[in-house]
């Protein structure tokens, strides 16, 4: 009989998921905006042998009605710092396909994947509040079906980008002056409904592969 394994991660969310958790006497509300606190949590999760440290995201100030602490580090920036202080735990950051361009997201994730030596994953969301959309030159979020359609294309384009430039292209032959073998670089020339991407990504995908993709919820 094959033994099945459960993968466990920790969602580091402010002082806790309950809106009033920050008011508890033992809460760490004063440290929410301190990257050293986030690093401490990630190290604790790594020590406990958890598989991943997961950062959600929200892109507007919420919680005025409850006083809930709702501000965040931008997750990929925070994970860059956390990756240099941890060694084995997976690191998952949240990216909204409603606001990001796939080329930008793929580059950021590729950079983090190499900085962390292959430990980065991305939680792809479509966002859920109009107040977020209004920070990105929109009046409201598109209908859910359109957001999911865009997200599907977003993910497909990122995957194509990660396949467009791999380490096999790197030659670095000093005598001949050849740095890259362009046979291994494949510009996308992509024309889709939501995205148009002409070239290849300019960060090579390492031999240990692309970032892992997740969808929470």
Regions found by a protein language model. Give the residues of each.
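Internal, glycine-rich beta/alpha segment that forms the wall or movable "lid"
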Residues: 4, 101, 106-217
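Glycine-rich anion/phosphate-binding loops
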Residues: 29-38, 99-111
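N-terminal beta1-alpha1-beta2 module of alpha/beta enzyme domains
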Residues: 1-85, 208-211
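Hydrophobic residues within beta-strands of alpha/beta enzymes
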Residues: 53, 91, 120-122
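Short His-Asn-centered micro-motif
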Residues: 56, 94-95, 215-216
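Glycine-enriched alpha-helix->loop->beta-strand junction motifs that scaffold or abut catalytic
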Residues: 85-88, 116
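The substrate-binding groove and active-site-proximal loops of carbohydrate-active enzymes
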Residues: 25-33, 65-69, 90-100, 141-145
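Active-site beta-loop-alpha junctions enriched in small/polar residues
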Residues: 13, 58, 96-98, 125-129
């Amino acid at each position: 009989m094959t033994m099945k394994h459960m993968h466990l991660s920790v969602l580091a969310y402010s002082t806790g998921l309950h809106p009033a958790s920050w008011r508890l006497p033992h809460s760490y509300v004063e440290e929410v905006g301190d990257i050293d606190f986030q690093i401490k949590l990630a190290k604790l999760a790594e020590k406990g042998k958890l598989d991943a440290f997961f950062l959600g995201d929200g892109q507007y100030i919420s919680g005025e009605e409850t006083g809930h602490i709702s501000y965040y580090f931008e997750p990929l920036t925070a994970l860059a710092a956390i990756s240099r202080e941890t060694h084995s735990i997976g690191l998952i950051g949240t990216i909204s396909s409603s606001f990001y361009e796939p080329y930008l997201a793929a580059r950021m994730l590729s950079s983090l994947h190499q900085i962390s030596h292959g430990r980065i994953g991305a939680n792809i969301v479509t966002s859920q509040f109009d107040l977020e959309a209004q920070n990105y030159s929109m009046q409201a979020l598109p209908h859910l079906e359109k957001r999911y359609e865009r997200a599907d294309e977003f993910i497909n384009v990122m995957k194509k980008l990660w396949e467009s430039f791999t380490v096999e292209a790197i030659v670095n032959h000093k005598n001949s002056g050849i740095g890259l073998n362009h046979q291994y670089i494949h510009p996308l020339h992509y024309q889709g409904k939501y995205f148009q991407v002409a070239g290849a990504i300019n960060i090579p995908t390492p031999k240990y592969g692309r970032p892992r993709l997740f969808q929470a919820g």
